[in-house]
Regions:
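Bacterial Sec-dependent N-terminal signal peptides
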Residues: 1-24
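Aromatic (Trp/Tyr) and acidic
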Residues: 23-110, 114, 144-179, 214-231, ...
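Asp-box/WD-like beta-propeller blade repeats and closely related beta-sheet repeat scaffolds
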Residues: 139-160, 170, 186-211
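Solenoidal tandem-repeat scaffolds enriched in leucines and small polar residues
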Residues: 200, 212-253, 271
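C-terminal beta-rich recognition modules with glycine/proline-rich loops and embedded aromatic residues
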Residues: 236, 304, 370-378, 383-480, ...
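Flexible glycine/proline-rich, aromatic-decorated loop/lid segments
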Residues: 257-261, 315-334
């Protein structure tokens, strides 16, 4: 796709967005689209390139090999037998098309574009005349998949995933339209969305259901933005409002019996705790933010504010993962954050990024980007290997030789029977530049840091912003501001919470020995006074071409301790430097990590290892290791060097032990791990 076409599509997107915003309210802050940011860094750009060259082709290949594509062919022919396991397997194709569309916006690829068109033709052929699209039924309506039910929609709340499939179709269609300007997938999505809106809604002549797996709400909002069809937004809001009205057993502790697994235990506006399936929840909260922004419904906003506070103060892991329980892939009770059995589905981390970005656009507070960054740099990208074709479904915080948890993954896999996470990765990675900047009137927010060149428009004037840095390894940040002509506006540079001695925006985690170092800022080489507003350094002035802002974020090695209510982390400490949480892995630590202790006062120093794990800063120092003799009767402690690597980089060198939370005393060591 040439630049002229790309610019035309971008203008079309802006026009559509503005037409919708003119009809109703919207987010007060708007993200700068990822196509306006050209990366030139050594951290994200290689990952985005690998996603384009390896992850997306591998994902499409697996969809072919496993029969996901064949299901569409059979649905078109109305013959055969559904040949994969789950009725939501259709979405792996949709999500990969979405990711590929994002990638096409960055890397024009005629061959990839043609392949996507071939897939879209198959999807179109599988769609029924009234817009219904669900291969698990259409292949053989008289004998559909067992989760589908004997007729359309009848098992939607429980397990059919019909509306879940539709939601991912909508998101893929919007992404493809914006990337290519083609309507082939968008028209399929419109026919399906029109059907959904005609079937579901208020009134005795329509069906009433709380969708079994949220995402259709987010998809309908995106369709509304593109088409301006108000019924899409209304139906998204309606689906959210259907929750909490089904006759469950409120006295039951079983999440499937009381409705909490589906977040269906209370009306959404009355919910104040993150509960149930973590991915479903994250998509719901993101959709609630969308609806709050677009309708001005304060009740939605109040609810997600309360839920966010619950997650950040009681239910998020130190590396940004959410969803502690493998049983139902759910949030656990408050402060229940086990390490060895941590589930932390990669999809849940992705949903958490979506939700926190929306919370930022509602409130303009950097604390939401702090959480987004924590998830993004740690518990999310750990979900994809550096080769681009191996994945974690779950993201554990501790592996011991004695580990036996059934959900624990100690190595990545190329694919899964339920492969929602790999295909979700394909669409998240290329969208990362879209989280870097945002605008509100004459305010330009800088949220994430990566060497790049960006073009934005402020008060109808073009402004080029060039970032130069080696983030996340180095805290020296340089911003070159180049307006087309002198222009007054406010530059809002995020000063991360970790650079202000805050481990997380709650008391769930704290730095045990906060550094006295503070962020510093210069303008054109001279120190400048600035004020902090909601976590942002605010520089308001008339900017001229060639202005340079330099920021130094202190990258001290910090010891992190958990709230005393987190029993699994009692007497233990985690290590963080900048946005990165660190772990010890067996290859660097004499084959063991479960026996390492980090007494108070141990100093760890950063050291760049260019040839290790695609280039990382490791932390080294003198720790101690506990050993037990062969008879199990004598314990000894020996001085031992420790090497810690970024958490995201573990499990690239074979199976073995890994530790995030280190005991500070011998009494906290698990002596049964040998």
């Amino acid at each position: 796709m040439d630049n002229k076409l790309r610019n035309t599509i971008f203008v079309l997107f802006l026009c559509l967005s503005f037409s919708v915003r003119a009809q109703l309210k919207d987010y007060p802050i708007q993200g700068v689209t990822f196509t306006q940011v050209k990366l030139d860094d050594k951290f994200w750009l290689p990952r985005i390139e690998t996603n384009h060259k390896v992850t997306i082709p591998a994902s499409f290949a697996r969809c072919e090999e496993t029969g996901r594509v064949k299901n569409f062919d059979m649905a078109a022919a109305k013959s055969g037998k559904f040949c994969t396991v789950y009725p939501f397997d259709d979405t792996d194709i949709y999500k990969t098309i979405e990711g590929a569309s994002f990638s096409l916006s960055l890397y024009p690829d005629k061959k990839l574009s043609q392949y996507i068109d071939t897939l879209i033709m198959k999807v179109a052929a599988a769609q029924e005349p009234d817009g219904y699209l669900y291969t698990a039924r259409t292949i053989n309506p008289s004998a559909p998949h067992e989760w589908a039910g004997p007729e359309r929609w009848i098992l939607e709340r429980d397990k059919s995933h019909e509306l879940y499939n539709s939601g991912h179709l909508y998101e893929a269609a919007v992404a493809h339209f914006l990337a290519t300007g083609q309507r082939n997938l968008l028209d399929i999505a419109i026919r399906n969305a029109d059907l959904v809106c005609s079937v579901f809604g208020p009134g005795s002549d329509k069906r009433h259901v709380a969708p079994g797996h949220q995402v259709v709400e987010m998809g309908l909002v995106k369709m509304y933005r593109i088409t301006g069809k108000k019924e899409y937004l209304a139906t998204a809001k309606y689906f959210l409002e259907q929750r909490g009205h089904h006759p469950y057993d409120a006295k039951s502790n079983n999440p499937w019996m009381n409705g909490s697994y589906w977040q269906d235990h209370k009306p959404v506006v009355d919910q104040d705790e993150a509960i149930g399936h973590a991915v479903r929840a994250g998509y719901q909260y993101a959709a609630m933010a969308d609806v709050a922004a677009l309708t001005g419904d304060e009740k939605f906003l109040k609810a997600i504010d309360a839920i966010w506070n619950n997650v950040v103060s009681k239910k998020i892991y130190v590396q940004g993962g959410v969803g502690a329980l493998g049983d139902g892939e759910r949030f656990g009770d408050n402060y229940y954050l086990p390490n060895e059995s941590a589930y932390n589905e990669t999809c849940a981390a992705i949903a958490n990024v979506y939700w926190n970005h929306r919370m930022f656009m509602l409130h303009g507070d950097s604390k939401y980007i702090d959480i987004l960054e924590k998830s993004l740099y740690n518990g999310l990208i750990s979900g994809v290997g550096m080769d681009g074709k191996s994945f974690f479904y779950t993201n554990v915080l501790e592996v011991k030789n004695s580990s036996h948890d059934q959900h624990q993954e100690s190595s990545r896999s190329g694919w899964f029977t339920c492969s929602c996470c790999p295909t979700n990765i394909t669409r998240l990675i290329p969208s990362v530049p879209g989280y870097m900047y945002a605008q509100q009137g004459d305010k330009l927010y800088v949220n994430l840091f990566a060497s790049s060149k960006s073009k934005v428009t402020i008060n109808k004037k073009n402004v080029e912003v060039i970032q130069s840095n080696n983030y996340p390894w180095d805290g020296d940040l340089k911003f070159s501001i180049n307006p087309a002509s002198s222009l007054p506006f406010s530059l809002m540079i995020r000063i991360p919470g970790w650079a202000q001695q805050q481990a997380i925006p709650s008391d769930l985690y704290t730095f045990s020995n906060p550094s006295s170092s503070k962020a510093s800022l210069t303008l054109n080489g001279k120190p400048v006074e600035y004020k902090i507003e909601k976590g942002y350094a605010v520089l308001t002035r008339t900017w001229k071409k060639g202005d340079v802002v330099s920021v130094n974020l202190p990258m001290d090695v910090q010891r992190v301790v958990a709230n005393a209510n987190v029993k699994d982390d009692a007497g233990r400490v985690a290590i963080q430097r900048g946005p990165l949480v660190y772990c010890a892995e067996w290859p660097d630590n004499s084959g063991r990590t479960a026996n390492i202790i980090l007494p108070q006062g141990i100093a760890l120093k950063p050291e760049l290892k260019k040839d290790l794990l695609n280039g990382v800063v490791v932390l080294t120092g003198d720790a101690a290791a506990v050993t037990v003799d062969a008879l199990g009767t004598t314990i000894s402690t020996v001085k031992q060097p420790i090497v810690a690597i970024p958490y995201y980089a573990w499990a690239h060198r074979g199976k073995g032990e890994m530790t995030v939370w280190f005991p500070e005393k011998v009494t906290s060591v698990d002596l049964n791990s040998k």
